[in-house]
Amino acid sequence: MGEEHKPLLDASGVDPREEDKTATAILRRKKKDNMLLVDDAINDDNSVIAINSNTMDKLELFRGDTVLVKGKKRKDTVLIVLIDDELEDGACRINRVVRNNLRIRLGDLVTIHPCPDIKYATRISVLPIADTIEGITGNLFDVFLKPYFVEAYRPVRKGDHFVVRGGMRQVEFKVVDVEPEEYAVVAQDTIIHWEGEPINREDEENNMNEVGYDDIGGCRKQMAQIREMVELPLRHPQLFKAIGIKPPRGVLMYGPPGTGKTLMARAVANETGAFFFLINGPEVMSKMAGESESNLRKAFEEAEKNAPAIIFIDEIDSIAPKRDKTNGEVERRVVSQLLTLMDGMKARSNVVVIAATNRPNSIDPALRRFGRFDREVDIGIPDATGRLEVLRIHTKNMKLADDVDLEALAAETHGYVGADIASLCSEAAMQQIREKMDLIDLDEDEIDAEVLDSLGVTMDNFRFALGNSNPSALRETVVESVNVTWDDVGGLDEIKEELKETVEYPVLHPDQYTKFGLSPSKGVLFYGPPGTGKTLLAKAVATEVSANFISVKGPELLSMWYGESESNIRDIFDKARAAAPTVVFLDELDSIAKARGGSLGDAGGASDRVVNQLLTEMDGMNAKKNVFVIGATNRPDQIDPAILRPGRLDQLIYVPLPDENARLSILNAQLRKTPLEPGLELTAIAKATQGFSGADLLYIVQRAAKYAIKDSIEAHRQHEAEKEVKVEGEDVEMTDEGAKAEQEPEVDPVPYITKEHFAEAMKTAKRSVSDAELRRYEAYSQQMKASRGQFSNFNFNDAPLGTTATDNANSNNSAPSGAGAAFGSNAEEDDDLYS
């Protein structure tokens, strides 16, 4: 009676907060006593594994026992156990050669199993690796093999390598064959066969470099999903039988190119030991009637014969397009054949079909139902943690300098997929080689060992590579590698601060937004007179956040073809989401986002459709994706009001003409790398240029520099002419004094920009924004402030119950008269839209 019933937190009885843990449960290895951490060996014997006495007692082993040691990628070998009490519990020592045989590194885990019933070998076959016997004469058996096997008890495993030292040399051998079984101990009467063609190391290394789970980074959750659906049915089909369901038949992997879809399928095949049958989509197709379907049937038959098997169809969209959209009869027949083959697979035939594509929506929908491709796994662009994993994988065999910070690189490579990171590492290594090119003699056959030892990829090499690469998802969109910092933007301090809050905070402090349960604002509109630095501000924002920067020039998006303009906008936002965090900068926004309703004369209302598409894209920006839209215009009155509502471009920032201090700041920013005449006061220019925009000031600076360059070139020419006249006029004696005069450094006639140059430049300077235009901008800005400042005096205690927001608005709304018509638009008529 008193029994307390606890309500289930979920239909499955699992606390929903534990969901993430179960999603990757298959990746967690269960820690057992016989799993040992690998340390480096002290004595370099190829046949031993050393563990301490406690571990030996726990595993019920004795010194000298033969054990089976399992590593990665289904590799194992047989070794003899020795005691080393300097080791900690749960650790073991294995030498480098054995580690290579097991495909493991220091710090990895191996499992140990007793192997008491190992037999003696009747015959083993060994062959040397070619590059280790160069220059050796004499009998390999007498010098190397006989002492190695006669002097010690040696268990061997087919396929293993071992290194033998003899005299001053060491030779590497491979066990090619063992009789009667794969594992055996070499005894006194074992026949050792060693004659044959030496093995080429390149061929061996290709076999050793098979892809495994360790070679895949950045998609931990997806890896867990695929292993659940592929590895479990292949290795333990009884699990599904016991629970009474059919195992999955097919998995469809989709995602941008370069994320590792093909690599993942190969890794699963290598680690499970399944037969791997690769079908490259286009290779199946044939012009002969019936041959394409026949090729598919053969692939499935071959896989069923060699079960457990994985059939991997790469680029499946090329052989299974939507049947109602294709004109070719062959494609339709191939799709139908694939459907019947997948339906015809026996329930527990131990064959799994994996397909990969980067265009999942162009595949025939009949393939995407349960029983065919049951599961769809989105292998997306990795986040910073994923990128760090991928960087570690690609740099594990690279020689890195001490200053390389992989975490910083991972943080800076937004939008990079695995293939981009591989390319980045390769480019950084090439840059290191280029830097050492002076020390390398290309004509020599061999490169000096000192030069090879001095190679090491530095952080500067990675920075260089970063500057020369961009994410492959954005290759066709012009992604500008922007190098504009806040220092390049003079003045506008308040606006800079506001921008930092809008764009930097969500990227650098996402935890704060989570804490307050809000999603950050994603849109900003700069408006103001031409030349005030709106575009420059957007570039500086992208650099400071180290986000990708997509610059969209309004008129470029418009196309004469029906629907093409909207499609261009969709593509840009899709790419921005793929490479997030991204700043999408819409320059001259008024050209593509004009107020709707007035575009009847253009291409069937193309402008209206573009605005509609832009609105839906801004609303559809996924909350998890950091995509910021910055618009810039100098005609804010022409922009559709729906774009300016909160949730879209909700922060309207007026970029005014600079005041005197801002003008001085702009001049300093523009001239910070330019030599100026000592004592030249820029304040005089700043004071004189009332009403000038940043672009107007840049014109003055460029004009002054132009005059300085002109004077410098003319002075140089005059100096050269004088020298020639001097040489022709008198025969100069080459005395010591003459030689000294020759060597004297030439004095630069124009070393800096002078006051005269600026005075000359000021004569042609002019304002680009008239007073009348400026008044219109100021009035519009005041109108926007007034419309958004209705409740500036709001106080919780002051608002009595029963008063409506409208009452408060009416009492506070004091927009300046005429402000609504600032740009010639009639605000009174607009307000009466629904009357």
Curated annotation (Swiss-Prot):
It catalyses: ATP + H2O = ADP + phosphate + H(+). ATP 1 binds at P257, G258, T259, G260, K261, T262, L263, N358, H394. Keywords: ATP-binding, Cell cycle, Chaperone, Cytoplasm, Endoplasmic reticulum, Hydrolase, Isopeptide bond, Microsome, Nucleotide-binding, Phosphoprotein, Protein transport, Repeat, Transport, Ubl conjugation. InterPro entries: AAA+_ATPase, AAA_ATPase_CDC48, AAA_ATPase_domain, AAA_lid_3, Asp_de-COase-like_dom_sf, ATPase_AAA_core, ATPase_AAA_CS, Cdc48_dom2. Changing E588D: Moderate reduction in growth rate. It holds the Pfam family CDC48_2. Its main location: other. SMART domains: AAA, CDC48_2, CDC48_N. Its EC number is 3.6.4.6. GO terms for biological process: ATP metabolic process; autophagosome maturation; cytoplasm protein quality control by the ubiquitin-proteasome system; DNA replication termination; endoplasmic reticulum membrane fusion; endosome to plasma membrane protein transport; ERAD pathway; macroautophagy. GO terms for cellular component: Cdc48p-Npl4p-Vms1p AAA ATPase complex; cytosol; Doa10p ubiquitin ligase complex; endoplasmic reticulum membrane; Hrd1p ubiquitin ligase ERAD-L complex; mating projection tip; mitochondrion; nucleus. Residues 1-21, 720-746, 792-835 are annotated as: Disordered. Changing N358A: Slight reduction in growth rate. Restores cell growth. One of its GO terms (molecular function) is polyubiquitin modification-dependent protein binding. It comes from the Eukaryota. The first ATP-binding region has low ATPase activity. The second ATP-binding region is responsible for ATPase activity. ATP binding to the first ATP-binding region induces intrinsic activity of the second ATP-binding region. While ATP binding to the first ATP-binding region appears to prevent ATP hydrolysis by the second ATP-binding region, ADP-binding to first region promotes the coordinate and cooperative ATPase cycle of the second ATP-binding region. The modification Phosphoserine is found at S472, S519, S770. Component of the heterotrimeric CDC48-NPL4-UFD1 ATPase complex. The CDC48-NPL4-UFD1 ATPase complex interacts with the HRD1 ubiquitin ligase complex composed of the E3 ligase HRD1, its cofactors HRD3, USA1 and DER1, substrate recruiting factor YOS9 and CDC48-binding protein UBX2. Interaction between the complexes is mediated by interaction between CDC48-NPL4-UFD1 complex member CDC48 and HRD1 complex member UBX2. Forms a complex composed of CDC48, NPL4, UFD1, UFD2 and SHP1. ATP-dependent chaperone which probably uses the energy provided by ATP hydrolysis to generate mechanical force to unfold substrate proteins, disassemble protein complexes, and disaggregate protein aggregates. By recruiting and promoting the degradation of ubiquitinated proteins, plays a role in the ubiquitin fusion degradation (UFD) pathway. Has a role in the endoplasmic reticulum-associated degradation (ERAD) pathway which mediates the cytoplasmic elimination of misfolded proteins exported from the ER. Present with 78400 molecules/cell in log phase SD medium. Belongs to the AAA ATPase family. This is Cell division control protein 48. It comes from Saccharomyces cerevisiae (strain ATCC 204508 / S288c) (Baker's yeast). The gene is CDC48.
